[in-house]
Amino acid sequence: MKEESIFLDYVGDSPRMRVLQYLIEGRGLDYTLTDMLNARVSWGTLNTLIPKLLELKIIIKTRKIGRATLYKINKDNVLAKQLIELYDKLIMENLDSMKIKIPA
């Protein structure tokens, strides 16, 4: 079943944006490639995207656990900051529009 996402509706539903949304939603944590499969992208696509995102410094390697490398969104990157701000604004707008006004 396909989940609805305000962020993906706004920026486009592509594998790259799905991975970035996944990392933005859990921006305080770091993730393995296997974890990132939860963003609904294939293993092959993920292995193509990660080197490009690292090259652009949108994501960074954080640590290794055994053979697994962990990654997270690079909050110091200008583009990543803008995507995070956009994500947060879209979520807040959506929450504001969902508020039900109750007469006093």
State the predicted function of each range.
Residues 1-4:
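Long, low-complexity, charged/polar intrinsically disordered regions in eukaryotic proteins
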Residues 6-16, 62-86:
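Short, cationic-aromatic polyanion-contact patches
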Residues 15-41, 69-73:
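N-terminal helix-turn-helix DNA-binding core of bacterial DNA-binding proteins
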Residues 22, 27, 52-53, 100-104:
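N-terminal secretory signal sequences
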Residues 33, 46, 63-64:
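Residue-level detector of family-conserved "landmark" positions at structurally sensitive sites
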Residues 41-55:
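Short amphipathic alpha-helical interaction segments
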Residues 54-64:
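A short, conserved structural fragment
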Residues 78-104:
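Amphipathic alpha-helical dimerization/coiled-coil segments
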